[in-house]
Regions:
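Class I S-adenosyl-L-methionine-dependent methyltransferase catalytic core
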Residues: 1-151
């Protein structure tokens, strides 16, 4: 999770998944643990239940991989894109993010190129990013900033 303080009332974590996965296959030296997905609200990023122009700031961090098993730790933790509909799904997600964003609001889009290059994903929105940053061990995680045009 990217939040410094999940309890901060300025943060709203929404996801279509919720649950806990026990991780028992780790060696005892690494400690056994659990992965948790505990959103504040449960809904689909393609159809958010918020009114237009509700937020000053939105972070869009969709699944980055197509067809990974939801029974795997990675699939449980990050979700999976459908191999047939991923482009439409991400396109709808971008549209929803900009719909709920106030004029001059910021959208931070997080993407990992493990499966799909960022350049392909950015074609799914007519909006143009303002700037971005690469991070991660292989520099394949991108943080991309958009600013919504004024109303």
């Amino acid at each position: 999770m990217m939040w410094f303080d999940k309890q901060d009332d300025r943060c709203l974590f929404a996801d279509c998944r919720e649950g806990v996965m026990e991780i028992n296959h780790l060696p005892a030296a690494q400690g056994r643990s659990a992965k948790k997905v505990q959103p504040d609200e449960i809904h689909d990023f393609r159809d958010m239940p918020y009114q237009n122009e509700s937020f000053h700031h939105v972070v869009y961090d969709p699944p980055h991989v197509r067809n990974i098993s939801m029974k795997s730790v990675t699939g449980f933790s990050y979700g999976s894109l459908d191999k047939e509909t991923w482009q439409d799904d991400l396109r709808l997600g971008f549209a929803e993010c900009f719909r709920v964003l106030k004029p001059h609001g910021t959208l931070i889009f997080k993407w990992n190129e493990v499966d799909i290059p960022l350049r392909e994903v950015l074609t799914l929105t007519p909006e143009k990013p303002l700037y971005g940053h690469r991070s991660g061990k292989k520099a394949n995680t991108h943080w991309v900033a958009f600013v919504k045009h004024g109303g």
